[in-house]
Swiss-Prot record:
NCBIfam families: MethMoxFADbindMmoC. Binds 1 [2Fe-2S] cluster. FAD binds at residues 221-235. Keywords: 2Fe-2S, Electron transport, FAD, Flavoprotein, Iron, Iron-sulfur, Metal-binding, Monooxygenase, NADP, One-carbon metabolism, Oxidoreductase, Transport. Residues 5-98 form the 2Fe-2S ferredoxin-type domain. It comes from the Bacteria. This is Methane monooxygenase component C. SUPFAM superfamilies: 2Fe-2S ferredoxin-like (SSF54292), Ferredoxin reductase-like, C-terminal NADP-linked domain (SSF52343), Riboflavin synthase domain-like (SSF63380). GO terms for biological process: one-carbon metabolic process. Responsible for the initial oxygenation of methane to methanol in methanotrophs. It also catalyzes the monohydroxylation of a variety of unactivated alkenes, alicyclic, aromatic and heterocyclic compounds. The component C is the iron-sulfur flavoprotein of sMMO. Coiled coil: none annotated.
Length: 348
């Protein structure tokens, strides 16, 4: 018999929220049904974005990737909320702060594919044009740093990506998407995506974005396609003619993976307070830019100055964790560090 259980979710900063979850639905689906947007992405147990600790209660855990949830983590009580079905009331410990949870109804719209451009060996620039709504409006609204869910045509498979451009009345959307060897959306981009196709788009979602702290310098650290929300935020600063000292540390593994360099140089030329450092972890002998990770470049700059910047991070968890450890060691308060983790996986 179907039962209804209470989920108590406690965030990293000690805030809590409660919602109901039926025994035949997973925790993420139940939260969404009640207009609570916990962090998630693939919703198929493959990417680990919704990983959390279940500290109390019994549940069924169904169909998780061992890469996303290794057996030793499962034994410790870690779960993927998109695959967690409650058998009793549950208490969940979320590994992020309350401000990263979105609430309320989220709109959706249709958008047409107008461009599909390979900009590096593993990255696609995916361009969409919002279709007019019932009033004829095309405009697309979001805060730079937020993300949207894109659904593969003819399926219910969706993935989350952040626009690299700014909100605009023309309804244009630009996404920078890493194409993996395996994965539903990666396969779609590689094999099936065509100009003229129509996708369902939900959003905006998320709370990653610029925080107002006066004239504090802003340092942005981006790993791979984590560059997209960073570029959107810096473009907003450009539009506002923000005078803050600004730096972008952009990292990839090899030179063929580099992308968006011309656009970054253009931003650097137009913003007198902006410095861009492109970093390659395994460079060739001809590479003349930064060698190593963007964390290495950030460390060098922090050690050579007395700056007390706000730090914005977007990229894989390992990069985020290393950056957070670095800034803590430099005495930068946690309230000056803002980040968006993403976890590329076979489910992406």
């Amino acid at each position: 018999m179907q039962r209804v259980h209470t989920i108590t979710a406690v965030t990293e900063d000690g805030e809590s929220l409660r919602f109901e979850c039926r025994s035949d639905e997973d925790v993420i689906t139940a939260a969404l049904r009640q207009n609570i947007f916990l962090m998630s992405s693939c919703r198929e147990g493959g990417c680990a974005t919704c990983k959390a600790l279940c500290s109390e209660g019994d549940y069924d855990l169904k169909g998780c990737s061992v890469q996303a949830l290794p057996p030793e983590e499962e034994e410790e009580g870690l779960v993927l909320l998109c695959r967690t079905y409650p058998k009793t009331d549950l208490e969940i410990e979320l590994p992020y702060t309350h401000c990263r949870i979105s609430f309320g109804e989220v709109g959706s719209f249709e958008a047409e594919v107008v461009g599909l451009n390979w900009v590096s060996s593993n990255t696609v620039q995916f361009l969409l044009q919002k279709r007019p709504d019932e009033c004829g409006n095309r405009g697309v609204k979001f805060e730079p740093g937020q993300f949207m869910d894109l659904t593969i045509p003819g399926t219910d498979v969706s993935r989350s990506y952040s626009p690299a451009n700014l909100p605009n009345p023309e309804g244009r959307l630009e996404f920078l998407i890493r194409v993996l060897p395996e994965g539903r959306f990666s396969d779609y981009l590689r094999n099936d995506a065509r100009v003229g196709q129509v996708l369902s788009v939900k959003g905006p979602l998320g709370v990653f974005g610029l925080k107002e702290r006066g004239m504090a310098p802003r340092y942005f650290v981006a790993g791979g396609t984590g560059l997209a929300p960073v570029v959107s935020m810096v473009r907003q600063m450009q539009e506002w003619t923000a005078p803050n000292e600004t730096r972008i540390y952009f990292g990839v593994n090899t030179e063929p993976e580099l992308f968006y360099i011309d656009e970054l140089k253009s931003l650097e030329r137009s913003m007198r307070n902006l410095t861009v450092k492109a970093c390659v972890w395994h460079p060739s002998g001809d590479w003349e830019g930064e060698q190593g990770s963007p964390i290495d470049a950030l460390r060098e700059d922090l050690e050579s100055s007395d700056a007390n910047p706000d730090i914005y991070l977007c990229g894989p968890p390992g990069m985020i964790d290393a950056a957070c450890e670095l800034v803590r060691s430099r005495g930068i308060p946690g309230e000056q560090v803002f980040f968006e983790k993403f976890l590329p996986s076979g489910a992406a």
